Amino acid sequence: MNHFPKLLSSQIGFDVAQTMLEYFDRHYRIFREAAVDAKTLFERGDWHGLQRLARERITSYDERVKECVEVLEDEYDAENIDDEVWQQIKLHYIGLLTSHRQPECAETFFNSVCCKILHRSYFSNDFIFVRPAISTEYLENDEPAAKPTYRAYYPGTDGLAVTLERIVTNFQLDPPFEDLTRDIGCVMQAIDDEFGHFDEAPNFQIHVLSSLFFRNKSAYIVGRIINADRVLPFAVPIRHVRPGVLALDTVLLRRDLLQIIFSFSHSYFLVDMGVPSAYVDFLCTIMPGKPKAEIYTSVGLQKQGKNLFYRDLLHHLSHSSDRFIIAPGIKGLVMLVFTLPSFPYVFKIIKDHFPPPKETTRAQIMEKYQLVKRHDRLGRMADTLEYSSVALPLARLDHALVRELEKEVPSLLEYEDDKLVIKHLYIERRMTPLNLYLQNGSDADVEHGVKEYGNAVKELMKANIFPGDMLYKNFGVTRHGRVVFYDYDEIEYLTDCNVRRVPPPRNEEDELSGEPWYTVGPHDIFPETYGPFLLGDPRVRSVFMKHHADFFDPALWQASKDKLMQGELPDFYPYDATLRFSVRYPARFGATGENDGAGDAQRAA
């Protein structure tokens, strides 16, 4: 600190720090209560309740920040506190965190509050936590009644089958299992299929995180197998095979499969973590290479993930020299998109003006992005990080990009010394645009991309999402080969749409007309008209009609809408249906496998 206070003499400084921590503690208490409630809702099979709980939790953080800011302004006139006291506030806050179980998240909460009160000129480590102050290494809750972060099991003592059964039953889920012995047998067979026979080393053990991970209609057991110097990750999803009866659905034993269920295109898990940094450290051991920012986000601590991401960006900028450039591909009508080639993300800014035929506003587009944030993304919609007042070094901006920014978003720019401050932007994982993937790919790539595209749109419609603009350029291909939607300015709930067939032409003039001969309402959709936009490439057309000929039939869309209107929530699985035990080992299930919906499994990883 440039001017470290020699004496922490300000009572206001201590009171403000304590107030901020009290509001963070309130936030985290609500966060944990949501995870506890998720277990109850899962046991009851209350899927609508789980959806509602997940949506409410997303907004809870901002509500606590807003409440805290209002108290600080009303009781302490926070905007007029002088610089020396603000420095003391931070130091008092650090002192209050020395034995805290969530210090990194509390520091982020401090930043969130300060950013609402202080001018951005104060956004330095003197006043906020640009860098962390409290270490989270080896942090555990050592209170006698507290759950450990993970439990260790030793199969060498009682055998693997008994150990696996104990792992499952220790979670004390209320509904009974249909046939836990059968399911444990499937787990053991899957382990043997994946790894074959392996010699048990003296340190052979299984570590299992103490809390279940809830999302959609599944509860996941997450852990790792330790044997000699090998660390083998696993996740076991538990599902209701029918109301009030549970089963282990599969076991995921490959790192890439775990990375998909923890990916940026899925909604956040609800998981009860007394010490979140310990959970994240554990998850890093089974998904090495996955940024901590993404893991914090996936377990529901998206503000901490956002904070870590920004630190990662600043660190990368200080250790790289390439320039931000306009993103390659077809330019959008609504968003200006740029990227830093050495950094695997894109930066998206809403333009000041939209040319015809776009009829929307900045506020409406921002609401669409919030809709996606709150909605179940099912592995088919990219998560976004939203930032305000992002300062980028001018020397790192390509001249063509600066000209484009000044042309398209002048209202969002401020020049500040050697930096360009962008008042508002979104950041997303960079993907290969699907149109380029199909254009440049082999025949096998085209088949994969088209099949994935159709699956993605069909899964989105079953989740009550109509993408609006379904051109290939609005979808991307992830590094795992998944097709993900990422252009949200025309997104709508399918239940708000009016699915229509194209009326037959009234005469030859109608038939030859390039314009519709029928009225089109603002929420009307005509699936039969999508073909000319999607099937122009002969390779694409052939594969599309092979896998998704029903895509252009309004009946498909209307059937999904009807089920949604009746309150149905379809089953989705963030792994291939062929991995499900009932599909993979049908002989173990006999007649019981007929009722578990295996034939209708949707792949939504």
From Swiss-Prot:
<comment type="function">
    <text>Bifunctional enzyme which can phosphorylate or dephosphorylate isocitrate dehydrogenase (IDH) on a specific serine residue. This is a regulatory mechanism which enables bacteria to bypass the Krebs cycle via the glyoxylate shunt in response to the source of carbon. When bacteria are grown on glucose, IDH is fully active and unphosphorylated, but when grown on acetate or ethanol, the activity of IDH declines drastically concomitant with its phosphorylation.</text>
</comment>
<dbReference type="GO" id="GO:0008772">
    <property type="term" value="F:[isocitrate dehydrogenase (NADP+)] kinase activity"/>
</dbReference>
<dbReference type="InterPro" id="IPR046854">
    <property type="entry name" value="AceK_regulatory"/>
</dbReference>
<dbReference type="GO" id="GO:0006097">
    <property type="term" value="P:glyoxylate cycle"/>
</dbReference>
<keyword id="KW-0547">Nucleotide-binding</keyword>
<comment type="similarity">
    <text>Belongs to the AceK family.</text>
</comment>
<dbReference type="Pfam" id="PF06315">
    <property type="entry name" value="AceK_kinase"/>
</dbReference>
<feature type="binding site">
    <location>
        <begin position="327"/>
        <end position="333"/>
    </location>
    <ligand>
        <name>ATP</name>
    </ligand>
</feature>
<dbReference type="GO" id="GO:0016208">
    <property type="term" value="F:AMP binding"/>
</dbReference>
<keyword id="KW-0067">ATP-binding</keyword>
<keyword id="KW-0378">Hydrolase</keyword>
<dbReference type="GO" id="GO:0005524">
    <property type="term" value="F:ATP binding"/>
</dbReference>
<keyword id="KW-0816">Tricarboxylic acid cycle</keyword>
<keyword id="KW-0418">Kinase</keyword>
<dbReference type="GO" id="GO:0006099">
    <property type="term" value="P:tricarboxylic acid cycle"/>
</dbReference>
<feature type="binding site">
    <location>
        <position position="348"/>
    </location>
    <ligand>
        <name>ATP</name>
    </ligand>
</feature>
<keyword id="KW-0963">Cytoplasm</keyword>
<dbReference type="InterPro" id="IPR010452">
    <property type="entry name" value="Isocitrate_DH_AceK"/>
</dbReference>
<protein>
    <recommendedName>
        <fullName>Isocitrate dehydrogenase kinase/phosphatase</fullName>
        <ecNumber>2.7.11.5</ecNumber>
        <ecNumber>3.1.3.-</ecNumber>
    </recommendedName>
</protein>
<dbReference type="GO" id="GO:0004721">
    <property type="term" value="F:phosphoprotein phosphatase activity"/>
</dbReference>
<feature type="active site">
    <location>
        <position position="383"/>
    </location>
</feature>
<keyword id="KW-0904">Protein phosphatase</keyword>
<dbReference type="GO" id="GO:0004674">
    <property type="term" value="F:protein serine/threonine kinase activity"/>
</dbReference>
<dbReference type="Pfam" id="PF20423">
    <property type="entry name" value="AceK_regulatory"/>
</dbReference>
<dbReference type="GO" id="GO:0005737">
    <property type="term" value="C:cytoplasm"/>
</dbReference>
<keyword id="KW-0808">Transferase</keyword>
<dbReference type="GO" id="GO:0006006">
    <property type="term" value="P:glucose metabolic process"/>
</dbReference>
<dbReference type="InterPro" id="IPR046855">
    <property type="entry name" value="AceK_kinase"/>
</dbReference>
<keyword id="KW-0723">Serine/threonine-protein kinase</keyword>
<keyword id="KW-0329">Glyoxylate bypass</keyword>
